[in-house]
Amino acid sequence: MFATAIVAVLLAAASSAFPHAAREASKDDANVSVQLSAVGNTMVKAVVTNRGDEAISVLRLNSVLDSFPCRRVDVYKEGKKMEFEGLLAHHDMQNLPDDVFATLNPGDFAENTFDIAETVDLSAGGPVTVLSEGVFLLARSDSTSISGMVQYRSNELKIDVDGVLAAKVESAGGLRRRNLDKRTSFYLDTCTPAAMKNLTALLKSTTDYADAGARAATNGSLATFETFFKKTDLRTRRPVASRFRAISNETSIIDGGIVRLTCSDDFCKGTINAIADSWISFITICPRFFSAYPPTSPECHATDQTSILLHEMTHMRHVYSPGTNDFAYGYDNVTKLPADQAINNADTFAIYAAGKFFFFWFFVPYPIASSIPGLIYFHRFLPWMLNGKVIGTCRRCMPTSLLRRHLGGKSL
């Protein structure tokens, strides 16, 4: 009887907990424009202009305005996208300093000049097309808290590359790899004993998160899946589940898999928590990763060490191809991505899987609670009241597949 009442309450609330109305970011947004121009053999200048009528602050990180050798542009040769050989950095999005934003009044612009040979092998030379397309994360002009996002697509820049000159460009990834090869020859050899112990445990919890994500993508709530990935057909669900299973297979091996982990890197600066080098299947765990986040978090949609490691694993193209990109961070932003970006966005996978795995009721973890009929949980904080006293709190996203099972297989 008590369990039946719980299900009734949750069913009534669930329609608002997993809204279909989370607005996707339109690719036709015109408030921000990006213009690319060639300023040397492989040097490109990007000019970002505020075309709107209000001041905005554009996040430079993981964008065409970033000085870090991230995926600022895509390069195409003979109609085929060339392999990205740069780095992807995971940033702390909750404690961003002022200098990682470009504040633009209406009509103002910011620019960045970079060498595309840093992140793409152009030694063969010849004609290529350069394009930047993606998302700018935005803050209000008086804040450093992310409050929205805007889609953009640049012009297509044609360049005839001199391969001999391009081959002389030292790629940031290549320089980093040589330094790592001097120091790192096996799993976690640059980590302290405490960090090694922590990461070994985190690989186990990452396996659990990935397993939960795979189960949910295969048999879970269609409504929840659609909130994150925008489509619910098998052509969408199967690759999502397959990526999770591939990650689970990798992280369960611990020290015998494809991916190598290190705790030492000269790029670990500022807000960077971790760095993914998909080209050589290398993940760097930066010092702030251990100090800024708990191993797991009971807060709904919160970032924790396990979700960061899962996020980084989705970038690894040798684990599951293609590796993901970093279009957006955080629940509010990833759920606004269109379908083609959502299925290739690392944080979409991380948040979806984390929400499917870990929550509390009477401080009982999901693997135990999911086997007990009647222990069904909700998307946000939900105190259960008995005789005026709080007897438990759900603090992680509701496992909707469990609710669906108790509702006789009906989708929310």
From Swiss-Prot:
**Which positions carry the propeptide annotation?**
18-183
What is annotated as the active site? E312
Q: Which GO terms describe its cellular component?
A: extracellular region
Pfam family for this entry, one: Peptidase_M35
Q: Could you tell me which Gene3D superfamilies the record lists for this protein?
A: 2.60.40.2970, Collagenase (Catalytic Domain)
The GO terms describing molecular function are:
metal ion binding; metalloendopeptidase activity
Q: How is the cofactor bound?
A: Binds 1 zinc ion per subunit.
Q: What span is annotated as the signal peptide, if there is one? A: 1-17
Binding of Zn(2+) occurs at H311, H315, D326
Recite the UniProt keywords alphabetically: Cleavage on pair of basic residues, Disulfide bond, Hydrolase, Metal-binding, Metalloprotease, Protease, Secreted, Signal, Virulence, Zinc, Zymogen
Look up the EC number in the record and give it. Answer: 3.4.24.39
Question: Would the keyword Protease turn up in this protein's UniProt record?
Answer: yes
GO BP annotation list: proteolysis
The subcellular localization recorded is:
Secreted
Question: Which reaction(s) are listed as its catalytic activity?
Answer: Preferential cleavage of bonds with hydrophobic residues in P1'. Also 3-Asn-|-Gln-4 and 8-Gly-|-Ser-9 bonds in insulin B chain
Look up the domain of life of the source. Answer: Eukaryota
S-S bridge residues: C191-C263, C268-C286
Which cofactor does this sequence's record say it needs?
A: Zn(2+)
The family annotation for this protein states: Belongs to the peptidase M35 family.
Q: What does this protein do?
A: Secreted metalloproteinase that allows assimilation of proteinaceous substrates. Shows high activities on basic nuclear substrates such as histone and protamine. May be involved in virulence.
**Name of the protein:** Neutral protease 2 homolog MEP4
Question: Gene name, please?
Answer: MEP4
